[in-house]
Amino acid sequence: MTLNERIAELRERVRQQRPLIHHITNFVVMNDTANVTLHIGGLPVMAHDRAEVAEMVTAAGALVLNVGTLSPDWIEAMLIAGRRANELGIPIVLDPVGAGATSLRTASNRRLLEELQIAVVRGNSGEIGALAGMGGVVKGVETVVEVDDPTAAAKALAQQYRTVVAVTGRQDVVTDGKRVFLVDNGHEWLKTLTGTGCSATTVIAAFAAVEREYPFAAAAALACFGLAAELAAPAARGPASFKVAFYDAIYHLSADQIRAGARVTAVAG
């Protein structure tokens, strides 16, 4: 089976199994990430109260922790849900939104990485560079200075916390500290919408819920996400029409389209 055939098969598994994805995520993207979860084939739940997260996560296939609109109560809820997910072997996908922009964000993300076993960290170059201690400058939640070598930063962070790191950008990099996947799918229109990185994190979680080879799951998810953007682009007249076409493309993404269009390369570590 070729790599693209494996990606297509994994995408169909998500559709068939319909994993519940528990999100503790930010206010900006809740609606969008819930819809993307549905369109890729999963079931979303947005539950962040400390009183219920440990119970809610028991039914989940994966847990998304997104610190975009963080607060002390939400960080505590993330830790409660994360500890329970670790007990049950449920994968956690961390989106370290704005790491490096403020000391609170950087410290909160490091606390989550230190106290929980995270399956996948998905961030932009600046966020991953900041957490790895290798530079990168984040203004708000956007990278304004990229790290010189995103692959090296991703490997360093993956090795430090025994996790998988996915750096999204012009070329996506996924690594567990040894193996590396490069993903070349995507489109410039993605930059015109807020929350596309958070939505990519959601797709990674849906794939990780049904595939425990997390480096491959993350790379496959990013390939499908980027390919959907490519397929949507010809219908776009602006950001709003692109968003509608993009959601439709995620929903309709077929095995034939993936086999023909996914651009993922496995490289030596």
From Swiss-Prot:
Binding locations of ATP: 122, 168
NCBIfam families in UniProt: PRK09355.1, thiM
Cofactor: Mg(2+)
Gene3D superfamilies xrefs: 3.40.1190.20
UniProtKB keywords: ATP-binding, Kinase, Magnesium, Metal-binding, Nucleotide-binding, Thiamine biosynthesis, Transferase
Biological role: Catalyzes the phosphorylation of the hydroxyl group of 4-methyl-5-beta-hydroxyethylthiazole (THZ).
GO molecular function, one term: ATP binding
Catalysed transformations (reactions): 5-(2-hydroxyethyl)-4-methylthiazole + ATP = 4-methyl-5-(2-phosphooxyethyl)-thiazole + ADP + H(+)
Protein name, per record: Hydroxyethylthiazole kinase
Highest taxon of the lineage: Bacteria
Gene Ontology BP term (one): thiamine diphosphate biosynthetic process
Pathway: Cofactor biosynthesis; thiamine diphosphate biosynthesis; 4-methyl-5-(2-phosphoethyl)-thiazole from 5-(2-hydroxyethyl)-4-methylthiazole: step 1/1
Recorded family membership: Belongs to the Thz kinase family.
Gene that produces this protein: thiM
Organism: Chloroflexus aurantiacus (strain ATCC 29366 / DSM 635 / J-10-fl)
Binding site for substrate: 46, 195
Pfam families linked: HK
EC number(s) on file: 2.7.1.50
